[in-house]
Amino acid sequence: MRSYEIKRISPAVNKTSQKIGPKILVNPYYGCEHQCLFCPANDGFLKRKAFDDFREKGVIRVVENIIDHVDNYILNNDYAKVIHLSPVSDPFQPVEAELQLSRQIIKHAADINMPVAICTKGSVPGELYPLIQKHPHSFVQISILTINEAKRKMLVRGSGASVEELLNEIEAMSDYGIRIIARIDPIFPYITDDMAEFEALVDELKKRKVRYIVSSVADVIEGALDRERGYLEAIQPGLSEKYTNLYTEKINGRLHANTEYRENIFSKLKEICESKGLEFGITWEPDINGNSINHKYSHQISNML
């Protein structure tokens, strides 16, 4: 029995939508049952009532006419190259099994010969593998935070596949010929920044034919540290103070761990990955002035994201 309420919506299609570049960003679900620590879908960063309703009332809004919106974005964008599913809420959270909107989008993408870029902490049904594999530019990003299942449960506080399930899923998709990016992302300071555990996870991913690994360090919306103080203390006494002392750089409206910590982490992660013949990259990470530091750590993998 689900512990959330579904609210079905069919927002009007904006026929004059602005050009948005090569990525069509698609969120069929507003709200995410995974409830990951510091996730922008549920921490108030996105100033939309739909996301507030999930956090405050347990209501997931689902966009029933999502295919109409996808087609409209394609029509209004000359350079549309990929459907990104999803940039915020997980497309394969438990509600998907009931409503199957993500399945509809993937099937539609296959019908119109448009590649999809999927990002999930959940399980992608095997029935979709042929549709994903059909387009040579489609790929799947599996978010696997750590090899330590107990730590994963601390951070993915709602649903989400286990470490073993995610590794099995990666292996199955790799064997099917689907391009995979493993996202060890984000790194949570003092929780998942153990380099021995990171290396052990990289070894398991390499066994499953993963070639690309992406990472980042968690950033935090203002107020979230205070809201999560009790939870951080339950994980480790003194952890909330460590986070307060580490998250001192406010950049573009969010708090970031100081640049020295982040660069030290990325240098170590890159060294581990490259020593094993894997490509390493980071998602967008700014310095204190808001300038990207990605060029220091990313290779051609960045072009896939």
Predicted regions and their residues:
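Conserved Radical SAM active-site core
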Residues: 1-141, 147-154, 163, 167-168, ...
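Auxiliary Fe-S-binding modules of radical SAM enzymes
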Residues: 1-8, 14, 196-305
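Alpha-helix N-cap and loop-to-helix initiation/capping positions
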Residues: 58-62, 97, 157-165, 193-200, ...
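Hydrophobic faces of well-ordered beta-strands that scaffold small-molecule active sites
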Residues: 81-83, 116-118, 140-142, 180-184, ...
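Active-site beta-loop-alpha junctions enriched in small/polar residues
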Residues: 88-90, 121-123, 143-147, 185-189, ...
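Surface-exposed cleft-lining segments at the edges of enzyme active sites
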Residues: 91-92, 150-159, 185-190, 255-256
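A short acidic (Asp/Glu
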Residues: 95-96, 128-130, 191-195, 225-227, ...
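Conserved strand-turn element in the central/C-terminal portion of the radical SAM core barrel
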Residues: 158-159, 173-194, 220
